[in-house]
Amino acid sequence: MSFTGTQQKCKACEKTVYAVELLSADGVGYHKSCFKCTHCKSRLQLSSYSSMEGVLYCKPHFEQLFKESGSFNKNFQSPAKSADKSTPELTRTPSRVAGRFSGTQEKCATCSKTVYPIEKVTVESQTYHKSCFKCSHGGCPISPSNYAALEGILYCKHHFAQLFKEKGSYNHLIKSASIKRSAAAAVAAGVPAASVPES
């Protein structure tokens, strides 16, 4: 008696995939060992992969693809392969017009770094990274539909109410918000936080 296996082929290597090694993603079968990022070749997990038109990527490279091209068009920018290159690619300064094509110019209200569309949260005409959009008191995750803001500082509703109950007013929060804004501005300007005077 012989076991013939399945007729399903791995999309990556086109060889037969047996049930014990079958991984099915987006309705397509792969060997576990063939389920890799197209760009870096690292092994992927079903819980942490992205695909575009059947091409597999790890989450960081999928996001990088979007950031570099401004769209999900499956093409990473590849460096020119010229033999007479005298300076490494990473040390070159961008041209004057490069800023016009580098995506968004929006800055995060919390960290002052560029916010790309894939990681953007906008509330009250302020833009944040998803990772920066959290309660300033406890670091709790918040959402655009479940937060409170005072003087531009974000809070979860629980901590906002708790801080009000502690003092009976929001005056101490306004002072704290002013200090946090001053410290953030100093960090963005390159001044050490210890030298920022408290008001």
UniProtKB/Swiss-Prot annotation:
Q: Which InterPro entries match?
A: Znf_LIM
**GO cellular-component term (any):** cytoplasm
Q: SUPFAM superfamilies from the entry?
A: Glucocorticoid receptor-like (DNA-binding domain)
GO MF entries: actin filament binding; metal ion binding; mRNA binding
GO BP terms, alphabetized: actin filament bundle assembly
* Domain spans labelled LIM zinc-binding: 8-68, 106-166
Provide the free-text tissue specificity comment from this protein's UniProt record.
Expressed in roots, leaves, stems, flowers and siliques. Barely detected in pollen.
Question: What keywords are annotated for this sequence in UniProt?
Answer: Actin-binding, Cytoplasm, Cytoskeleton, LIM domain, Metal-binding, Repeat, Zinc
**Subcellular location, in the record's words?**
Cytoplasm, Cytoskeleton
Q: Other comments?
A: Cross-links actin with a constant of dissociation of 0.5 uM.
What the protein does comes down to: Binds to actin filaments and promotes cross-linking into thick bundles. Has an actin-stabilizing activity. The actin regulatory activities are not regulated by pH and [Ca(2+)].
Question: What is the annotated quaternary arrangement, including any partners?
Answer: Interacts with F-actin.
Q: What name goes with this protein?
A: LIM domain-containing protein WLIM2b
Tell me which species this is from: Arabidopsis thaliana
